[in-house]
Amino acid sequence: MDFVADICVCSLSIRRMDELGSLIPSNRREKTKESYFGTYHHSTSAASKKVRAVVKAMFTDAFASLPFGRHDELRILDAGCGLGFLSCVSAEFYKNARITGIDTFEHTSLKRSSAERAKENARILGFSDRIDFKKSDVFKFTPNEKFDIIISNLVFHNFGKMRFEAYSRLSSWTHAGTFVAMGDLFFRPKTDIAHLTKAFKIMREIKPKRGFGQYALLVMSKE
């Protein structure tokens, strides 16, 4: 995950932070401990929490539009999971889903990143039995199953021109009926969109109301 300096988090339109920006531990005994999802590059702790509030709202909107029940037993992949924020958001929304989160856990854009910290976040929030974090990247990951939903946030732009190969690899982990929710800073029509539409049908484009640069969340389906 990599947030850049030109994201104007102070002007974001958000609701109460405890409603959107926080994930509440499902086990009351864990309330004395706090999850830590990191401070993004060129950001502060408070600003990063506001960014996550908006991201959670947008992905929750995307999940609500998919033809799945909240208690369906889904297989979800979080490609570039960082410290597990989006993995936990999906586990909170889809109550019986099993989530696999992959990351190198080495990117300098997210301070104190580690698989151990991601696992601890899931444990604190009560999702450790349904989230499995693996140290890998999209170019080396070889799953033995196909996924019902693939999620990713602010990952693919980091790959430069190699992102097109990454898009193709992502497509190989899907089956007919898979949905992809991908948030990123740019989706260029002649390159990114053209490549993605070879494999997926774009159903929706969700954007923040203002102040989030060129960020957009694409909701796509595999047919």
Feature-to-residue mapping (PLM):
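Class I SAM-dependent methyltransferase Rossmann-like catalytic core
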Residues: 30-66
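Conserved class I S-adenosyl-L-methionine
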Residues: 72-82
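Conserved SAM-binding loop of SAM-dependent methyltransferases across substrates and taxa
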Residues: 83-95
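S-adenosyl-L-methionine
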Residues: 112-140
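A short acidic, Gly/Pro-enriched loop at the edge of an enzyme's catalytic core
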Residues: 139-150
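A short SAM/SAH-binding and catalytic strip from SAM-dependent methyltransferases
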Residues: 149-162
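A short glycine-rich, Lys/Arg-flanked "PGG" loop and its adjoining helix->strand segment in the class I
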Residues: 164-176
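Conserved beta-strand signature within the Rossmann-like core of class I S-adenosyl-L-methionine
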Residues: 177-185
